Amino acid sequence: MYPKITIDINKLRDNATFIKNLCEKGGCKTALVVKSMCANHDIVKELDSVEVDYFADSRIQNLKKLKDLKTKKMLLRIPMLCEVEDVVKYADISMNSELDTLKALNKAAKTLNKVHSVIIMVDLGDLREGYFEAEDLKENIKEIIKLENIEIKGIGVNLTCYGAVIPKNDNLSRLCDIADELRTEFNLELPIVSGGNSSSIYLIDKGELPEGITNLRVGESMLLGRETAYGEDIIGMNNDVFELKCQIVELKEKPSLPIGEIGVDAFGNKPYYEDKGIRKRAILAIGQQDTDISSLMPIDDKLEILGASSDHLIVDVSDSNTSYKVGDIITFRMGYGALLKGFTSEYIEKELL
C-alpha cells in the first residue's frame, strides 16, 4: 500500500557504524538518536549490534518499546512530572534541569528500589533547556547530590535545535570547564560531558572538538548522512537510506493559475502562483497531515512540487521524460522534517528493505 517510506537497513546500519567510529576518532562515545523514526522497533533492533552506548529518544513511550534491546536508553527531553515513574523504569539515564523534577525522580526511584542516572543540562546560549547562570547551577547541584536515589553522571548542552547557535571549540570548551569546576567543587566524577548533537560532528574532522567532550547525541547525521551545523554531506555516508513513495490519483492538464479571487489556503497562508499556461499536474495521495512537504525532493529532477493541502500533493510533471499515468509511483528523497512527520503518520507504511 501507498504512501510508504522504504528503509535500506544495511545502509542505515553502515551509517550508524560510521558515526560510532567517527565519534571514537573524536574521543567520545555515541548516543544514537532514534526519535525521528519514532523508535520503530523493527528498525532500531537492527542497530543493536552496532553497540553504541545509548539509544536516545525524547519520548518515554518510545524508549518503553525498546526495553528488550541490550543497548542502554537515554531520555533526551527533560521529564514531565507525570511520567517520572516510567522514566525511572524505562530510561537508564535522563536529562534534567529542574530540581523539583529531580526530587520527583528520586522519590520514584526510591519506590522502585533503583538509582536513576541523570545528566544536568547547561544552557550556553541556545536558550532552550538548561541552567543559564553558573551560580544557579551550583546551588542546585548542592541539593541534587543530597538525593539518595539520583546519580549525577554528567552534564550536557543543547545547541542549534532552537537558537541555531553553532557548536564551536570555545562554547564546548566552556562546557568542559564547567564540568571540571563541578568535579573539583563537589567531588563528582562526571564521566559524561555531552557536547550536543549532529551539529557538533563537523568539529571532529576539523580537529576542534575539545578533549573533554565524552559524548555526542547523533540522529540526523546517522539518518541522512550530513552534519547539521552547515548542512554539508559527510563523505563516506549514505544519504539515500529513506525514500517516500506516493501514488498518483489524478493526472490532468490544467491552468497553472487558479481562477477567481485568491484568499488564504487551508493553513492560513496566502499563496503565490505564477502563470505558466496549461500544465500537466499529478495529484498524489499524501498531504500536509502526513509529512513536511517543504522537505521532499523528487528523485525525478524534472518534477516540480506545486503545493499541498491536508491530503493532496500537487506535482507538475510537464517537463519529465517519464510518461506518468494514474496509479504510477513518484519517489522522493526526504529531509529531516519530512522524515520526522512521515514516521509519525500512521497513514504512511514503513517497509524495511
UniProtKB/Swiss-Prot annotation:
**Is Isomerase found in the keyword set?**
yes
Which terms in the GO cellular component ontology are assigned?
cytosol
Q: Which GO terms describe its molecular function?
A: alanine racemase activity; ornithine racemase activity; pyridoxal binding; pyridoxal phosphate binding
Residues at which substrate binds: R128
Which InterPro entries does the UniProt entry name for this protein? Ala_racemase_N, PLP-binding_barrel
Q: Describe the pH profile of activity.
A: Optimum pH is 8.5.
- For the modification N6-(pyridoxal phosphate)lysine, which residues carry it? K35
Tell me the protein family, please.
Belongs to the alanine racemase family.
> What is the enzyme's main class?
isomerase
Q: Does the keyword NAD apply?
A: no
Alphabetized UniProt keyword annotations: Isomerase, Pyridoxal phosphate
The protein's role, per its UniProt record:
Involved in the ornithine fermentation pathway. Catalyzes the conversion of L-ornithine to D-ornithine. OR could also racemize basic amino acids such as lysine and arginine. Serine, asparagine and alanine could be also converted by OR, but at a lower rate.
The record's listing under SUPFAM superfamilies reads: PLP-binding barrel (SSF51419)
Q: What chemistry does it catalyse, as a reaction equation?
A: L-ornithine = D-ornithine
- Tell me its EC number(s), please: 5.1.1.12
- What biological processes does GO assign it? ornithine metabolic process
Protein known as: Ornithine racemase
Q: Report the active site residues.
A: K35
Q: Which Pfam families match?
A: Ala_racemase_N
Q: Which CDD domains match?
A: PLPDE_III_AR_like_1
Cofactor names: pyridoxal 5'-phosphate
Assembly information from the UniProt record: Homodimer.
